Design a protein with these regions (language model features):
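ATP-dependent NMP and nucleoside kinases share a basic, alpha-helical "lid"
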Residues: 77-153
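N-terminal phosphate/diphosphate-binding loop that engages ATP/GTP or pyrophosphate donors
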Residues: 11-80
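Residue-level signal for inorganic ion chemistry
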Residues: 20, 73, 102, 116, ...
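Active-site signature of alpha/beta-hydrolase-fold catalytic machinery across serine-
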Residues: 7
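Walker A/P-loop
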Residues: 2
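Anionic, Ser/Thr-rich low-complexity intrinsically disordered regions
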Residues: 121-122, 128, 134-135, 139-145, ...
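Conserved beta-strand scaffold positions in the cores of enzyme catalytic domains, especially
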Residues: 16, 133-135, 189-192
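NTP-dependent small-molecule kinase module
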Residues: 68-77, 86, 145-154, 173-213
Length: 213
């Protein structure tokens, strides 16, 4: 979904907000500090010391890049995509203090409008009154294959497909069953199943929807 959101923002001249990267950045910081990600009090104590920023990586017209992700002035753009972070991000994201802090930051980006935001609770909780909501979905197997390609493109270690499928399925389970802002489709969102669609097909489809509002 980040690839699609990034290209849509580029095509429409809007700001791209990768909310998932913010949760990954905090997860990376928690792990880097040796804090137990399952300890909400310890994680909450770290929140004031974790300054997360997203900046543009340039103006590549053909291939818009993901935002550069910074934690306390250190670039963590690649570090937040590792399997270690992926395995813990749902645990961190389910914590009330974490969601309250990061949702406030995300909503500040949206005050003026004109953004494309992606994230697992973006349409239901972060921006419930958005003009256009898309619920992108694909099978676990397809998402695992895409994750392998993404990691390889970033020259990061690429786990076995079965390992990624397990990680993704477990993350879905955690995110769908959490008490705070669970993963679900907003009632006014349009579902787009992407298994048999290229990224370009999905981008064109959503851009056409945007032009109709």
């Amino acid at each position: 979904k980040s690839t699609v959101a990034r290209h849509i923002a580029h095509q429409l001249g809007l700001l791209y907000l990768d909310t998932g990267a913010m949760y990954r950045a905090l997860t990376w910081f928690v792990l880097s500090q040796g804090v137990d990600p399952t300890d909400p009090l310890a994680v909450a104590e770290l929140l004031p010391t974790c300054d997360i920023k997203l900046t543009s990586q340039g103006k590549d017209q053909e291939n818009p890049q993901p935002p550069e992700v910074w934690v306390n002035g250190q670039s963590v753009t690649q570090a937040i995509r590792t399997p270690e972070v992926t395995a813990q991000v749902s645990t961190i994201a389910a914590q009330a203090a974490v969601r309250e802090a990061l949702v406030k930051q995300q909503q500040q980006y949206g005050v003026q409008g004109g953004i494309v935001a992606d994230g697992r609770d973006t349409g239901t909780h972060v921006f419930p009154h958005a003009e256009l909501k898309i619920f992108l979905t694909a099978s676990v197997a397809e998402r695992a294959r895409r994750r392998q390609r993404d990691l390889a493109a970033q020259s990061l270690p690429v786990p076995e497909l079965s390992e990624l499928e397990t990680l993704i399925a477990e993350r879905d389970r955690k995110d769908s069953s959490r008490d705070i802002s669970p993963l679900r489709q907003a009632e006014d969102a349009t579902e787009v199943i992407t298994d048999d669609l290229s990224a370009e097909d999905v981008i064109d489809k959503i851009c056409a929807m945007y032009q109709e509002i």
